[in-house]
Amino acid sequence: MANKILDEESLKQVGRSGEPRTYEVERGAIRRFAEAIGDTNPLFNDEHSARESHFGGMIAPPTFCRSMGSPIPDVRIGALGTSFRGLDGGSDWEYFKPIRPGDRITVQTRLADLRESEGRLGPMVFITMETTYTNQFGELCATQRSTGIRY
């Protein structure tokens, strides 16, 4: 690859985390989120129906995690520095525990990988971030693995 972007200093950043951020989950926020995405599932907006379900009460839609931002670690990419063009390379989600009203969810993102490849427009860098969503009991509720493409 002629135009190498990643250098040793760039690669040393892998594993760094942004500051954790904690959110208090409110019943009204769950209802408004479900309404905004057009999801009428009673688990998300009807306490009585949800109480009768195997969940035993209201829960948040799995995608509710997207409403909880997380500071990402600053990433400096060799020759690109912090100014570059980029694309969203997609996300993979795993869900483990439902999120409930009253939960305190701590969100933290870490730089999981930096990888360089050659594209039609020249060298590209794939940045992989992993975000965890953990409740007040230390239980992992969800993980997100997202990829950004910089060139």
Regions found by a protein language model. Give the residues of each.
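Hot-dog-fold acyl-thioester-processing enzymes
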Residues: 2-90
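HotDog/MaoC-like acyl-thioester-processing domains
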Residues: 1-11, 97-151
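A beta-strand/beta-hairpin structural motif
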Residues: 88-94, 148
